[in-house]
Amino acid sequence: MMMMIQRRGGERQDSSAAAYNVVHKLPHGDSPYVRAKHVQLVEKDAEAAIELFWIAIKARDRVDSALKDMALLMKQQNRAEEAIDAIQSFRDLCSRQAQESLDNVLIDLYKKCGRIEEQVELLKQKLWMIYQGEAFNGKPTKTARSHGKKFQVTVEKETSRILGNLGWAYMQLMDYTAAEAVYRKAQLIEPDANKACNLCTCLIKQGKHDEARSILFRDVLMENKEGSGDPRLMARVQELLSELKPQEEEAAASVSVECEVGIDEIAVVEGLDEFVKEWRRPYRTRRLPIFEEILPLRDQLAC
């Protein structure tokens, strides 16, 4: 009888511990990584948690999660440069499946630190991985998580998202010609009101006011695209309308940085339609024919 009581008491204790972990979204166990998550989520001591994540990484305990969680926490603590160094130094310890997620964190860190050129290169690298069929482990969709909820991301949506980020980065570099080309292709894959506004900004910066006005009315004001009901978006639309004045298009070179679009940018904006079709075929090749044609021209056309 005593053994049964002890057993039931143990079950109640285990059940209580499990419920505690669920409430605080903690992993089970007592490893260095689990202790780091407890300090981060329960004790809310970010600096102590970062030290414990370091210990977990050095102990090879759940390195995939430990490195990513530590980098994100460092970003919150305004230690983004340290987070970049950590990912670059220890990502080789992580699994192949974790590399895509680490790239996403690294892109945000580059953006926060103003390292735009490195952000551009990594975004183009991610696009190239998609073209090669290396993203999503060769599948047309992947499962993502946001605010504790899981959802499916299609390769088209991911490609459009990356192109949008690449267009924004080109805008920060004042390369509005490349940004325009990237945003146009992103809009063909998955139309979005915010990207349409960014495209209008690129056109205005190049003096293409009539075309910008046309896109603004056609793709934002007259269409019910994703994001079109956002009050912040409508405020931005009003700003764009105030910039648009009836005048002839000016020469792009007089208002934009002079830089021909190189082969890497061509690889970004060409062949995406064929690429999307390839994902819908059951037996696609690893590389699209268009990229076989582009590769020999890389040295000749590089910016």
Curated annotation (Swiss-Prot):
Keywords: Coiled coil, Nucleus, Repeat, TPR repeat. Its main location: nucleus. Pfam families: TPR_8. TPR repeats lie at residues 64-97, 100-133, 160-193, 195-226. Induction: Induced in response to sulfur deprivation. The keyword Nucleus applies. The keyword Signal does not apply. GO terms for cellular component: nucleus. Residues 62-89, 232-253 form a coiled coil. InterPro entries: MS5/SDI1, TPR-like_helical_dom_sf, TPR_rpt. It is found in: Nucleus. One of its GO terms (biological process) is regulation of glucosinolate biosynthetic process. It comes from the Eukaryota. Belongs to the MS5 protein family. Involved in the utilization of stored sulfate under sulfur-deficient conditions. This is Protein SULFUR DEFICIENCY-INDUCED 2. It comes from Arabidopsis thaliana.
